[in-house]
Amino acid sequence: MRVIMVKGFSKTGKTTTVTQIIKELRRRGYSVGTVKDIHYEKFAMDHPGTDTYKHTQAGAQRVTALGEKETDILLSRRMDIDAVLKYYKEDFVILEGDSGADCPAILTGATEEDLAKRMTDQVIAVSGIISGKLDHYGRLPVINCLEEVEKMADLIEKATEEQKQEADVILTIDGVEIPMVPFVKNTLKNVVIGAVKALDGYEEGKEIAIRVKG
């Protein structure tokens, strides 16, 4: 599974960018999942008066609405993005909004000031409204996904290539192996290697074992 984030201020073209990328990746034969991060405290899919809301109010911690055309699983809490990704098995998962995931990102903006405020080392390209005004922003390409989505998809494939190869990582807590999706395995592997590769005794390809007693 490969993960890419599309982030930026509201009304700068995030959703348009995401939908165009979805269409192009599907055209290329990939399966695609998405996660929409919503920074609005009052947001809730469920609402007072519904039967599922009554279930939650009665104390149910997980409620499922099983309909003819869709199934909605409702949890009364915000989940960590790594936990959310465990539910996905698609080739690509696109995160709309800054969920805090450690993955390549596309930054949208309407102005260069927008870009400067949200720029991070994760960003591999710029898109959104500003793509009608610029070709490059510093070292980064600016791509209009309404006109050049193929170029953006090529870049995404290249930037997420390492995620495709599942890292050989095993995590145990009190002797119990903890299941992790490939994205989380690769993230954990990169963090550990980044921390120890400057130490004496480190050799690329060698097994690394860490034990932490909490």
Predicted feature residues:
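Conserved lysine of the Walker
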Residues: 14
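Walker A (P-loop) phosphate-binding loop of P-loop NTPases
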Residues: 11
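Conserved C-terminal guanine-recognition region of P-loop GTPase G domains, centered on the G4
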Residues: 95-134
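C-terminal accessory "lid"/substrate-recognition subdomains
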Residues: 27, 73, 91, 126-214
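N-terminal phosphate/diphosphate-binding loop that engages ATP/GTP or pyrophosphate donors
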Residues: 20-79
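The Walker A (P-loop) glycine that initiates the GxxxxGKT/S ATP-binding motif of P-loop NTPases
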Residues: 8
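Phosphate-binding/switch loop-helix module in NTP-utilizing enzymes
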Residues: 74-101
